[in-house]
């Protein structure tokens, strides 16, 4: 970049400049925030982590006769300007992502300088910057002195009017049909180029002294109504999708769709709805109603935090399933430990009192309906082999590669509770024997549940499934620590400090004993299948809860959120289905995941129509 003294306007940033905020790791400036919002609105399909959008001119990708200022948005010429050999250009920081579908930027002519030999356009990486855009291969430009367009050639073609000081020239790239058109002062000038390649950079070139231009990559509203043009093309692309020819096999197509819907309902245990749908569409149900209801009952137990009962019920309905899926068993046991800390598992529920100091702050999962997004996360492995869940909490740590049934060696740092002597080995039936002591009223009410209402929980009085008193403790995943020295008499009686197991000594001892059994199970699995880092992390996370007097407000307290039960529930449900030779994921979700992945591949291949055919647009 040229020295500040050589740059007109240097030191006078304009509103929306990208250079001011965020320097030194600070917060983004209001201008940067507004730019981000506008770009997100214009190009919602672009993943800016993978393919950043152009936001300014590149100080590293320019000829040395070019000077930059005002957040690298202002370009001025500082060469001799004797002939075409003194031409100079600059490219934007990033190429235009194909996922934009339609991309637009504007350039304001601050001064035409001596002769107004200015070019605005596009160029590929590596094109000579000692030339105006359009003169070389993979370079395209609209020049102000004669109004000609230059398409990879030194010979221009008549295109539009000339432009000079005060004019605003826009450049629109249509990545759907590979064309480009320009605008002048908000009015379209028509198609200038066709058959454009992918990965082009916004480019401007200057040639004579005094020439100054300002770029607008979205920092300010555009003169041209680009959003109206985008709406037009969105309608065209979606019309193509809607008009896809299937009339020749309409009956077959309808049957496929009906089977997909039916299998989705069955997968998630909506027994009554699946039965009614099958009756209306004459679609066969691939699973017996009794089995669906059994899975429904098990899912309900997990989502209520009664994991020990869910394990026992699974062993009763599906003998051998957990014994042949040690990873799943270990995940369930870790989740059971978390729920014992939470006070919802019947192992401690019958021991601890339901006093105001009790830790049962989460009444149940706030939503039992599956959460779906348009991305390939539909295709994630929720089975027993998946290492991505830690106690049912989606891990943010680096992914590990594991064999089908690996397991960890014991970690001495997992918890003080695991340091005590434990059996040298423990078989699965023994490790599950602790689940047999359950409250009888739970099983009696479970037998009466026969419809989809089984899968509904009463969480209306608890926003997001959390008691109101929790809102002051957990905010956006940030846990506020309280001074443990505070005199309890000064605390608000309406919000007493919660204690592990409500302060019940017997329940606390039961948790510690269960932790030892869990440690022993981990060691046995480690001997049989080898070390498993995912298991080690599960133990460390779960046992860490015991290090805090108030686990719900500690840094690892998010494990206690009922929403973290859902990955465990999904893994168990998928394993049950797989054991019955049924798909572990419903075909509908696989189709959505495949569609999302296809759109990503289209973007990487430079097919811009992917931006206007988002899966989100078809999910209501």
Swiss-Prot record:
Residues 35-222 form the B30.2/SPRY domain. Broadly expressed, with highest levels in skeletal muscle. The modification N-acetylalanine is found at residue 2. It comes from Homo sapiens. Belongs to the RANBP9/10 family. Its main location: cytoplasm. It is found in: Cytoplasm, Cytosol; Nucleus. Residues 291-348 form the CTLH domain. GO terms for cellular component: cytoplasm; cytosol; microtubule cytoskeleton; nucleus; ubiquitin ligase complex. SUPFAM superfamilies: Concanavalin A-like lectins/glucanases. The SPRY domain mediates the interaction with MET. CDD domains: SPRY_RanBP9_10. One of its GO terms (molecular function) is guanyl-nucleotide exchange factor activity. Residues 409-436 have a biased composition (Low complexity). Residues 253-285 form the LisH domain. Keywords: Acetylation, Cytoplasm, Nucleus, Phosphoprotein. This is Ran-binding protein 10.
